[in-house]
Amino acid sequence: MAKSLVIVESPAKARTIGRYLGKDYTVEPSLGHIKDLPRKHLGVNVEKGFEPAYFVISGKAKVVSKLRRAAQRAEAIYLAADPDREGEAICAHLKEILTDKTLFAEAGPTDGRPRKKRKPAKKKASAQASQKNGKVVALDMPPPVSMKTKFLRVTMNEITKRAVREAFEKPGQIDHNLVNAQQARRILDRLVGYEVSPLLWDKVKRGLSAGRVQTVALRVVVEREREVRAFIAEEYWTIHANLSAAEPPAFDAKLMEFQGKKLEIANQQEADKHTAALQAAVYRAESVQQKERRRYPVPPFITSTLQQEAARKLRFGVKRTMMLAQRLYEGVELGEEGSVGLITYMRTDSTRVGQEALGEVRDLIALRYGREYLPDQPRFFKSKKGAQDAHEAVRPTAPSRAPEQVRAFLSEDEFKLYQLVWQRFVASQMAEAVFDQTTVDIQAGERRLRAVGSVPKFDGFLAVYEEGKDEQQRAEEEEEAEAARLPVVREGETLTLNALKPEQHFTQPPPRFTEATLVKELEQKGIGRPSTYASILSTILEREYVRKDKGKLSPTPLGEIVSDLLIKSFADIFDVQYTARMEEELDEVEEGKLDWRAALEEFYEKFALDLERANEEMESVKAGLPTQETCDRCGKPMLLRMGRHGLFLACSGYPDCTNTREPEFEVHGIDSDDTTPESEVQLCDNCGREMVIKRGRFGTFYACSGYPDCKTTKPLTARGRGAEPVPLNENCPECGGQLVEKHGRYGMFIACSNFPECRYTRQKTLGIKCPECQQGELVERRTRRGRRLFYGCSRYPECRFTVGYKPLAEPCPQCQAPLTFEKHLQDGTVRFCRKDGCGFQVTVAAPEKLVEAAPS
């Protein structure tokens, strides 16, 4: 019989760790958090020092019962949740549920209330619950563990045999500073969500939510959108001269100075003047400088840079990246080798690398690429201020395990992410790349031109990996990227003018955020931490405060209104700098430098004042917000109001005047170049008047501006939604061309960019093997009319497996079926098993309206 019980969060992690521990250990999963604040009540006693009231999460009674039974037989209990605040809180709650005599839970569909249309279940004392006061239930559980039972905390940065052995040889105790930091964050978020969300329900519409950090992230997106709208493009010109020296080839030089000063050409008139002067000038090479330029590798990944690079290179959303990274960390089945953790812990802000890993990767570089690719000493990278250096960077657990060695055992997406992590880590310890750079300054009368050429001399780390660039970075580096090989040019040599190329340009607005650049912005501003970036982005997208179109984020009209209302009423709480300072205070709580209650008291003092004022002064969209528009029927001011299908303008003279119309704000997520060109006005087929873009119940459409006299409408077709494919970092297996992602009638698919010459296509998969044929992968599809989403095998019609629920690559913890599924019910989102006779089901998310909800 096993003498020790080990508790981890997931079945995958349990399988991997169990392989290394042997028969003296039983490893059980908790399936994530086991206790939390109540869903339907505040759960925080502000008057008693912000005392939280934690309950066993609805649907977790069976898990708790199983853990308590297993704990009865154990002499020692090892708590092995992830090495961060959330993991430490899980460990603290696990210890409580194993030692407390009485456990309480909120009454839910699985705790205390029978499900409808089902026969009464036979009584199971281990997991039954008795009703108490209609709201809280006391769970009937196996007895708590003996007071003599030892509780030990083990943490590991990677799940490998060596790391597991070292962790269990030197166990520690629960770090209550980490627990307090997590608890403080949870209470802060609960106070804001619980107190502010009902304001939005009252002033805007039910079902909306506010969050301490999500609102600040929304503010950042809104402010960027307004910068884009307010931007006024300015004209400017550049002039390039194509020149020849005594030896070929010809080359381009850019006009840089006039009369010894930097030249900026504002319009065509100035450009023509300089072009005429250059046409008549004599060109002489005044100076020729040659130097060696070195480019150094970037550090290995931290959480934020992993999310950014996966978005740039793989087009993965932040949530998807973290889900895949979690799988690679917890363990993947590698045939006879069994379950193996392939990467280190993925929630980290440290670039530190352990000595053993440094030795392994240096040996690999020398063996695989040659000694010339290995620097004399290992590279050490400086982590940002406040980074938790107890963690390492995100890296492969075994650098010698090359991506091609494990490809057969990974889904397509898992392989891509592992390859990215492996390449980045290996490149970070390689020699720098070397370029020969030549700069030629050319005098042409009163004007000076410059030509820059760069030639690779040694590829160094670029043989393995080159960091992707954001839109703005690419624009800034265009000229450097275009730098080509120059001919031999001698100082004093007279050059021949072949052609002049004046070009008109316009300054560009700041780019809208992508998921990658928003994470980068939040990190730079100190908003959020590695464990929260994914949830921040998911929340503002799921709440429809922000829309993502072709990878670009823009606020919805609802998002802008919510942001404006909250920032006006809670100017200090939702201030970017204040939010960043709160993150620093939570870090201080984690370090034991600040009492968690003191941090909460400082926050709540401001928050309570703002809340009281907001209840009285916040404007109501339901009542109508004033606008500059006037009613075209009676001349009274129009009000902006919220209806069932979104925002609309209504006459303030209601009920005497019932005039309404669509607001004239920009329809976000549809850029001007996505739809009809500005020069091509859409006219009504019925009356000939101009058509305008409107938003209705089923999306955006064209409507006649003559409404209500003419009620003609027609679909809005966006060229970008089918005709502009998105390039992928992958080549066509048939012709070698670049693969692109396209939007078809039944959803997204992947095709060759050389169409129609090459007709290679494949469906975009979820990265999950078909449970029926074990050969194809599951793909997202829509019914013929596009009304219903379902999932099917990529080998259709050979394999006809389909399912109406979203499949998850998470095994069932009860029957070990390879997949579980997700569905949305009135009581919330649940994860369940479809296998006959299993019955596993657990709530994974509260109903949308109850997330940080006010009392019903």
Report residues per predicted region.
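Basic, low-complexity terminal or inter-domain segments flanking catalytic cores
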Residues: 2-5, 16, 97, 109-125, ...
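Alpha-helical scaffold elements adjacent to nucleotide-binding pockets in ATP/GTP-utilizing enzyme cores
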Residues: 16-20, 66, 89-97, 163-170, ...
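Conserved short loop/turn motifs at secondary-structure junctions
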Residues: 2, 82-84, 205-209, 290-299, ...
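Intrinsically disordered, low-complexity regulatory segments
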Residues: 1-183, 256, 381, 469-472
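Metal- or metallocofactor-binding catalytic centers and their adjacent structured scaffolds
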Residues: 264-299, 490-493
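Short acidic, hydrophobic short linear motifs in intrinsically disordered regions
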Residues: 285-288, 297-310, 337-345, 509-521
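Core structural elements
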Residues: 184-195, 213, 243-245, 293-305, ...
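C-terminal or mid-to-C-terminal helical accessory/interaction module adjacent to the motor/catalytic core
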Residues: 159-241
